[in-house]
Amino acid sequence: MMVHDDDTTPHAPAPAADPAAAWIARIDPPLADAAAAADGPLAGLRFAVKDNIDVAGWPTTAACPEFAYDAATHATVVARLLAAGAVLVGKTNLDQFACGLNGTRSPYGAVPNAFDARYVSGGSSAGSARVVATGEVDFALGTDTAGSGRVPAGLNNIVGLKPSRGLISARGVVPAAQSVDCVSIFARTVELAARVLAVALGPDMLDPYSRDLPLATAPLPMRPRVGVPATLEFFGDADSAAAFERSLAQLEALGATRVAIDYAPLAEIAALLYDSALVAERYAAVRDFFDAHEAAVIEPVRGILAQGRRYGAADLVDAQIRLRALAQRVAPMWRDIDVLVVPTAPTHVTIEAMRADPVVQNRNLGAYTNFVNLLDYAALSVPTCLRADGLPFGVTLIGPCGSDWQLAGLGQRLHHASGLTLGATGAAMPAAAALPVPAFGDVPTMRVAVVGAHLSGMPLNGQLTERGAVRLRETRSAPHYRLYALPGTVPPKPGMVRVPAGEGAALVVEVWEMPMAAYGSFVALIPAPLGIGTLTLEDGSSVQGFVCESLALEGAEDITHHGGWRRYIESRRATPA
């Protein structure tokens, strides 16, 4: 049975700033897939979906009661999550037709911030973000066209994963601007957001914008170059300015290096979304309904859609050409940086202030978001700190199309470094868990254990990452090996040799997986006296790994007592020359 929060009608507006306004409808009992495996990857996790996403048997309202229709089938992404064992508990409020970044543009009521009900929650995926922040669900789906999957995350101390365009099917989603729409994921940890993405992604032949995207599986460098706008705008909000500086310091503590970038062309691209003929796609998405029922659409959404109706085809072509020219201008940025870092939202806005000046205040919230989908980038909003006034602050990590897993790796490190609790629940951050590894599909692969200069962050690690290798885990060898520092090797390398039972030790190794097609060229780079052989891990399994000829050990220092190459290198750095 569907339960609406007013217990009378699905179309009665909820009170402004009422926490119940986060929901448009709840399901009782929750919806589950009876055929889902009990040990599915999302088994038992409770989730909600933004009410512009179809769920069979439920009305889809897009926060416009007159527009509502009964969905005959699940959206592709909903079906995939249910099949993975997740349990659907309701549909959430949004800025009408996903047109806004603030969460107040809904006849069902304004969704308040989870930390202070006087402030906006951010939108348009307002309800989804709030119910994750408050712990009512484990994760939720939103959509993101101009920042709707990121701004609410940043304002509510949760993670907002905005995938590469077409990575998650948008079939069964009411379009906002279909060519750049993305289904987004809200969770309280990066790890869970990545788990949901691993289930949700995949091509869909019934979605014209779905893509079978190759994902970058090599982790970002341990010391990434982070691009930061040379000029920043916080609209007079000193607390947010200080919080962003603190966030950058956290990244630097993780080894990142700041690189100033020119934000002007990105800002110009952002402006195209609403200040050019590109806004016509907003109108086209709901043209038939809007032309017949314009009065049913609330302001300022009505004005935005009407603006889109005024443009002609030639205007749209001009805007697209301008976008491509700006994209060409921006592209060289990626030669100098590994990731772009911006404030998710530059300020917090009260509901009162938003209603007094809805266009300007909404535009301010999107100062660092609107360009991302137009340029086909991936993005991840990560909480980093609480401001001096106790309100949440987060940054968005942005990378090229297909960098989703790379951003998740860095985002997880940054989130854990923050020391924050989860959302508005007060729950402590759990121990870091390994992110799910994106599947290689039908591509044959080889696993190899590395022990020395090929470890993450070491000089030869690039020989793995440039071949598309993925770091699976850090583990230890079986206690059958000894480790030696080989003299005269550049860069310095160890030699690992198998010894008789009782004479060896368990040594730290990393297990990587790479496409088989790249394995031969990797092995060809290994110089004598090193080679590849079979190595036994502490769990008894065997993988390919680095071995060393015993003749090369003459004059080599036995460093087995360090337990691994990284600790040996660290000990040398700590010892005065």
How should these model regions be labeled?
Residues D33, K162-A242, P265, G409-Q412, ...:
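A short helix-breaking turn/cap at a secondary-structure junction
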Residues G44, A83, T134, D138, ...:
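Glycine-rich, small-residue loops and helix-cap segments
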Residues M1-D70, A75, F97-G100, F244, ...:
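Short, well-ordered alpha-helical
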Residues G40-A56, L88-K91, G172, G227, ...:
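ATP-grasp fold ATP-binding core
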Residues F47, I53-A56, R80, C182, ...:
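Gly/Ser-rich, acidic/histidine-flanked active-site/gating loops
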Residues T61-A68, L460-S477:
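Short Gly/aromatic-enriched secondary-structure transition segments
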Residues L42-C64, R223-R225, A277-A331, P383-L391:
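Short helix-loop capping/hinge segments that flank enzyme active sites or metal/cofactor-binding pockets
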Residues H74, A79-L197, N373-T396:
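Short glycine/serine-rich loop segments
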